[in-house]
Amino acid sequence: MIELLFPGWLAGIMLACAAGPLGSFVVWRRMSYFGDTLAHASLLGVAFGLLLDVNPFYAVIAVTLLLAGGLVWLEKRPQLAIDTLLGIMAHSALSLGLVVVSLMSNIRVDLMAYLFGDLLAVTPEDLISIAIGVVIVVAILFWQWRNLLSMTISPDLAFVDGVKLQRVKLLLMLVTALTIGVAMKFVGALIITSLLIIPAATARRFARTPEQMAGVAVLVGMVAVTGGLTFSAVYDTPAGPSVVLCAALLFILSMMKKQAS
């Protein structure tokens, strides 16, 4: 049993290390809908990967990165409100991906695995890919932490201090896209954003500094992964949703504790 769970557990722990600090910025900057858009569009990457006979893992990363860059470009053109634009792109990309996959009669596709993930199907090659992605994400966040914080707290002051706002914003969106692309196969397109939001929202109730919040979010994510996989193994439930459910339970407990104190 341990041999079966360990690769998935290790993958989840690594993803939690990236999702903690990144999710903090998603919560601070209210980017959850942006994350949902990229997550839904990731299924389109799967469809293109299968259609072009390319590894869907890399196709998902490519599509999410391209979409993130496109959203930054469209954000500068205020013909439509950004939430309207995100809603249109999210559901259009998800629908197109589902239609393309359904038209591939010669290819057997497990849509449930892509929609809800399968942490228990992690291979050694997957672990290497996740590790590389997590190292890149954490390194960029560490490198740009001060600029990202300045932009989040006060864009005007950040601009005065010489922060290149558009470049930093693009970098944050690309890092978010990379994280979603890496994690999509293991957590699923429909629930991946929750692993960014819930641990960070839970940590926010206990942290006094941004750095504390990022660190606590990582710990919450690790506990959720461990608890969710254990629950999945004992009761034979889907691994990804079990992890998210465990994270949601931790959030509810944090709210109850905060109210009691």
Curated annotation (Swiss-Prot):
<keyword id="KW-0864">Zinc transport</keyword>
<feature type="topological domain" description="Periplasmic">
    <location>
        <begin position="1"/>
        <end position="7"/>
    </location>
</feature>
<dbReference type="InterPro" id="IPR001626">
    <property type="entry name" value="ABC_TroCD"/>
</dbReference>
<feature type="transmembrane region" description="Helical">
    <location>
        <begin position="178"/>
        <end position="198"/>
    </location>
</feature>
<protein>
    <recommendedName>
        <fullName>High-affinity zinc uptake system membrane protein ZnuB</fullName>
    </recommendedName>
</protein>
<feature type="topological domain" description="Periplasmic">
    <location>
        <begin position="75"/>
        <end position="83"/>
    </location>
</feature>
<dbReference type="InterPro" id="IPR037294">
    <property type="entry name" value="ABC_BtuC-like"/>
</dbReference>
<dbReference type="GO" id="GO:0016020">
    <property type="term" value="C:membrane"/>
</dbReference>
<feature type="topological domain" description="Cytoplasmic">
    <location>
        <begin position="29"/>
        <end position="53"/>
    </location>
</feature>
<feature type="transmembrane region" description="Helical">
    <location>
        <begin position="122"/>
        <end position="142"/>
    </location>
</feature>
<keyword id="KW-0472">Membrane</keyword>
<dbReference type="Pfam" id="PF00950">
    <property type="entry name" value="ABC-3"/>
</dbReference>
<dbReference type="GO" id="GO:0005886">
    <property type="term" value="C:plasma membrane"/>
</dbReference>
<feature type="topological domain" description="Cytoplasmic">
    <location>
        <begin position="105"/>
        <end position="121"/>
    </location>
</feature>
<feature type="transmembrane region" description="Helical">
    <location>
        <begin position="84"/>
        <end position="104"/>
    </location>
</feature>
<feature type="topological domain" description="Cytoplasmic">
    <location>
        <begin position="257"/>
        <end position="261"/>
    </location>
</feature>
<feature type="transmembrane region" description="Helical">
    <location>
        <begin position="214"/>
        <end position="234"/>
    </location>
</feature>
<keyword id="KW-1003">Cell membrane</keyword>
<feature type="topological domain" description="Periplasmic">
    <location>
        <begin position="143"/>
        <end position="177"/>
    </location>
</feature>
<feature type="topological domain" description="Cytoplasmic">
    <location>
        <begin position="199"/>
        <end position="213"/>
    </location>
</feature>
<keyword id="KW-0812">Transmembrane</keyword>
<dbReference type="GO" id="GO:0055052">
    <property type="term" value="C:ATP-binding cassette (ABC) transporter complex, substrate-binding subunit-containing"/>
</dbReference>
<comment type="function">
    <text>Involved in the high-affinity zinc uptake transport system.</text>
</comment>
<feature type="transmembrane region" description="Helical">
    <location>
        <begin position="8"/>
        <end position="28"/>
    </location>
</feature>
<comment type="similarity">
    <text>Belongs to the ABC-3 integral membrane protein family.</text>
</comment>
<dbReference type="GO" id="GO:0000006">
    <property type="term" value="F:high-affinity zinc transmembrane transporter activity"/>
</dbReference>
<dbReference type="GO" id="GO:0010043">
    <property type="term" value="P:response to zinc ion"/>
</dbReference>
<feature type="topological domain" description="Periplasmic">
    <location>
        <position position="235"/>
    </location>
</feature>
<keyword id="KW-0406">Ion transport</keyword>
<feature type="transmembrane region" description="Helical">
    <location>
        <begin position="236"/>
        <end position="256"/>
    </location>
</feature>
<keyword id="KW-1133">Transmembrane helix</keyword>
<keyword id="KW-0813">Transport</keyword>
<keyword id="KW-0997">Cell inner membrane</keyword>
<dbReference type="GO" id="GO:0071578">
    <property type="term" value="P:zinc ion import across plasma membrane"/>
</dbReference>
<keyword id="KW-0862">Zinc</keyword>
<feature type="transmembrane region" description="Helical">
    <location>
        <begin position="54"/>
        <end position="74"/>
    </location>
</feature>
